[in-house]
């Protein structure tokens, strides 16, 4: 049998390193309960694991408060949350058609609902965006 070469990493990483499978298998066997919802031992231990992860990620990203770190399902969900959460009525967003659908779709949704205006800046045959085009698209 030949070894598979996975090239769809924009969708997910596969295969994952064995350490990930081992950790997650152990986590679900030992801590597969809702964190922070009850006072029994497994829930408390699970919350400690989750909060420990928050602390590690906060340090990794040079943050200052692990309680401000939010987990989501995936990058697409995160982008959707951020874009819809930050957009305000009357905002103008400059982007390109090179963006992933997880960026373009929420922007399109907000534009179609009259919340924001979107300007798409062009790109050349090599996929490069001219910074001057971005400057020209900006509004006060």
What role is predicted for each listed range?
Residues 1-140:
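Pyridoxal 5′-phosphate
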């Amino acid at each position: 049998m030949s070894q598979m070469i996975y090239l769809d990493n924009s969708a997910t990483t596969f295969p994952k390193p064995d350490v990930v499978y081992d950790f997650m298998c152990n986590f679900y066997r030992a801590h597969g309960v809702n964190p922070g919802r009850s006072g029994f031992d497994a829930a408390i231990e699970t919350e400690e694991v989750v909060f420990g992860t928050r602390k590690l990620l906060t340090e990794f990203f040079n943050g200052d408060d692990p309680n401000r770190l939010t987990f989501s399902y995936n990058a697409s969900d995160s982008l959707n949350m951020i874009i819809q959460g930050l957009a305000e009525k009357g905002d103008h967003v400059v982007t390109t058609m090179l963006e992933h659908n997880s960026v373009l779709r929420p922007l399109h949704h907000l534009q179609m609902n009259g919340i924001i205006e979107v300007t798409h800046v062009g790109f050349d045959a090599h996929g490069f965006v001219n910074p001057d085009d971005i400057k020209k698209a900006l509004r006060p």
